[in-house]
A protein has these predicted regions:
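C-terminal (or distal) subdomains of carbohydrate-active enzymes
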Residues: 1-210
Length: 211
């Protein structure tokens, strides 16, 4: 079960439509923000900001095959990379919030209580890079989500939720047939929730497989 609130805004020539989605059931701990943006702004940077009732000098950022803790912005380090998620857990360790996303990778942390995610950017350019003054122009669709958690950061749980956001189940129609793999089939699995299988391929010069 899902409820959605649609918010429409205009800024200059740009149009913004955002759906805030609340769920019941196994996704009740997640709030989704689905966005449709027609971006037509030059010399502009669009961020979303999460001012949280949480205090910590460090946040944890996803690196794809690991994570790293980083502090607040400085004069020389004010935008950092993260892939699927970033997390701010209160210094007490009693609770925290993970921010998930499906396609945006620039983050910053201006103070102990705030996470920000960069969404779109059209930089100011000089004549040598004039072709960049329409960077990110056009239509964009993307989702970011808020997930709260009790206690400290459970990286395995956060990674699982981020993977669910990014690797959505896809359904399609097909004719009825017996198939060759049966009703269930798995190429490979892990019984350790702290181990993620990211890739599986056959070796080039043997019958072995590389994980």
């Amino acid at each position: 079960l899902r409820k959605s609130l649609c918010i429409e805004k205009r800024y200059g020539e740009s149009l913004f439509k955002q759906y805030i989605r609340l769920y019941e059931g196994n996704r009740a701990d997640r709030i989704d923000f689905y966005n449709e943006v027609d971006w037509q702004l030059s010399n502009a940077l669009l961020k979303t900001e999460f001012p949280l009732n949480i205090a910590n000098t460090e946040a944890t950022y996803d690196l794809g095959l690991g994570s790293v803790k980083r502090g607040n912005n400085t004069e020389t380090a004010y935008e950092v990379y993260a892939q699927y998620w970033a997390d701010l857990t209160d210094r007490s360790g009693n609770y925290g919030v993970s921010v998930l996303n499906d396609s945006k990778y620039g983050w910053d942390k201006p103070d102990d209580n705030t996470l920000r995610l960069t969404l779109l950017h059209t930089p100011e350019t000089d004549k040598d890079y004039a072709y960049q003054n329409r960077q990110d122009f056009g239509h964009h669709c993307f989702t970011y989500s808020l997930v709260g958690h009790a206690g400290g950061l459970d990286k395995a749980a956060t990674i699982e939720k981020a993977e669910m956001l990014n690797q959505r189940l896809k359904a399609f129609r097909t004719d009825k047939h017996k198939g060759t793999l049966g009703k269930e089939f798995s190429f490979v699995s892990s019984n350790n929730r702290n181990v993620i299988i990211k890739a599986l391929k056959k070796a080039e010069n043997s019958d072995e497989y590389v994980v």
